[in-house]
């Protein structure tokens, strides 16, 4: 973008090969992450004097899928308010007209690391339990608002040095109503629930499976089910958890059931072998924080049949994590909108662009985007 076309209150910052057109309130940009969905920079908010993370969405209107994802991410970040879910601090675009609208910047709290980095650390039971508790609290809040995350993975969960945890990236999130009998979605394969792999309808428990995979990875230090492709992913799961019972297979579509039934049969590996005592830290001061308790919870989360998989509420009540629950403070409460309704259905890229632009204009009217005590 030429300097003459940079709007007032903005300036251009080259980050690698990307031109960031940023509000002047944000300085000291440095790249901290990049991927298919965009690039993320750390910066200093000169208005609040606090560190922030700024995400520039990558080509949000390249196609319908990108446009829908951008719309969902902005809407959910703006509406969901919970201490274990990353919050929206600000949002802006240098483009002033819908016809020119191509860039969206999202400003968030800056965290210290994601769980990919934490997995390499030696964590004691207190930290393992507390991280798991916070993941479940964040998911409970989303579910209470009728939202299934669908894309939980270590890179989408961020932490601070004091062990506080937040869930981010809602571009794939769907309402529970939308998810009923949905076709499989594109998401990181390793954390994909069996019912999704097999093309079944899915519900909130897809997130429980993903949390179980992440928890197991924190303990073992490596991915539990590193499938090379769709079929190999299923094989990796049954190699460890065993071939599911006939009652589960009977619920599959005929062609899928025939395929699964003709695969090699596996007996489940005992969880005492999968998660042996020597993989865990030494015992904690709290008698409930033991390898046996952690294994028991894992065995209830990593269940192929979603109807038999533990719910989020029951997982939060489990001895290994409920040590952190304070009923008097409502520490896992879900205050906020009772149900979030997302625009769905078939829309063109231009329609998604117009809807997101309208939401952003409304955000400008209700927030001090520039940090000068005025609305845009």
Swiss-Prot record:
Record organism: Ancylostoma caninum
Activity control, per UniProt: Activated by threonine and tyrosine phosphorylation.
Catalyses which reaction(s): L-seryl-[protein] + ATP = O-phospho-L-seryl-[protein] + ADP + H(+); L-threonyl-[protein] + ATP = O-phospho-L-threonyl-[protein] + ADP + H(+)
Pfam family, one: Pkinase
Any one GO molecular-function label of the UniProt entry: protein serine kinase activity
Residues bearing the modification Phosphothreonine: 183
Keyword presence, DNA-binding: no
Family according to the record: Belongs to the protein kinase superfamily. CMGC Ser/Thr protein kinase family. MAP kinase subfamily.
Role played: Responds to activation by environmental stress and pro-inflammatory cytokines by phosphorylating a number of transcription factors, and thus regulates transcriptional activity.
Modification comment: Dually phosphorylated on Thr-183 and Tyr-185, which activates the enzyme.
One Gene Ontology term, aspect cellular component: cytoplasm
Domain notes per entry: The TXY motif contains the threonine and tyrosine residues whose phosphorylation activates the MAP kinases.
Keywords: ATP-binding, Kinase, Nucleotide-binding, Phosphoprotein, Serine/threonine-protein kinase, Transferase
Enzyme Commission number(s) of this protein: 2.7.11.24
SMART domains given in the database record: S_TKc
Top-level taxonomy: Eukaryota, Metazoa, Ecdysozoa, Nematoda, Chromadorea
Phosphotyrosine, modified sites: 185
InterPro entries assigned: Kinase-like_dom_sf (IPR011009), MAP_kinase (IPR050117), MAP_kinase_CS (IPR003527), MAPK_JNK (IPR008351), Prot_kinase_dom (IPR000719), Ser/Thr_kinase_AS (IPR008271)
Record-linked PROSITE patterns: MAPK, PROTEIN_KINASE_DOM, PROTEIN_KINASE_ST
Protein name: Stress-activated protein kinase JNK-1
Keyword DNA-binding: no
Cofactor: Mg(2+)
């Amino acid at each position: 973008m030429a300097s003459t076309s940079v709007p007032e209150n903005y300036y251009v910052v080259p980050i690698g090969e990307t031109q960031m057109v940023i509000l002047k309130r944000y300085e000291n940009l440095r790249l901290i992450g990049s991927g298919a969905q965009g690039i993320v920079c750390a910066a200093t908010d000169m208005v609040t004097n606090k560190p922030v993370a700024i995400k520039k969405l990558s080509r949000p209107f390249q196609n319908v899928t990108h446009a829908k994802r951008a719309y969902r991410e902005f809407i959910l970040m703006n509406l969901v308010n919970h201490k274990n879910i990353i919050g929206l601090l600000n949002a802006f675009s240098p483009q002033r007209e819908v016809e020119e609208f191509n860039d969206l910047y999202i400003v968030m709290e800056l965290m210290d690391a994601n769980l990919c980095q934490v997995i390499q650390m030696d964590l004691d039971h207190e930290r393992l339990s507390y991280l798991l508790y916070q993941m479940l609290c964040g998911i409970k809040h989303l579910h209470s608002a009728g939202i299934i995350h669908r894309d939980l993975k270590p890179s989408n969960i961020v932490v601070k040095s004091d062990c506080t945890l937040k869930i981010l990236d809602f571009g794939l999130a769907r309402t529970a109503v939308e998810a009923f009998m949905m076709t499989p979605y594109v998401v990181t394969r390793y954390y994909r629930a069996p019912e999704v792999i097999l093309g079944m309808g899915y519900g909130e428990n897809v997130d429980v499976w993903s949390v179980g995979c992440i928890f197991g990875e924190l303990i073992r230090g490596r991915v539990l089910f590193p499938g090379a492709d769709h079929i190999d992913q299923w094989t990796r799961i049954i190699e460890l958890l065993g071939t599911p019972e006939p009652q589960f297979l009977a619920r599959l579509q005929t062609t899928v059931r025939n395929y699964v039934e003709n695969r090699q049969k596996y007996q489940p590996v005992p969880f005492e072998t999968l998660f042996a005592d020597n993989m865990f830290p030494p015992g904690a001061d709290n008698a409930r924080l033991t390898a046996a308790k952690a294994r028991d919870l894992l065995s209830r989360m990593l269940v192929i049949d979603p109807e038999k998989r533990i719910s989020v509420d029951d997982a939060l009540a489990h001895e290994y994590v409920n040590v952190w629950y304070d009923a008097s403070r409502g520490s896992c409460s879900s205050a906020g909108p009772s149900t979030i309704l997302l625009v769905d259905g078939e829309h063109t890229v231009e329609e998604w662009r117009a809807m997101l632009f309208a939401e952003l204009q409304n955000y400008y009217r209700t927030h001090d985007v520039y940090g000068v005590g005025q609305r845009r």
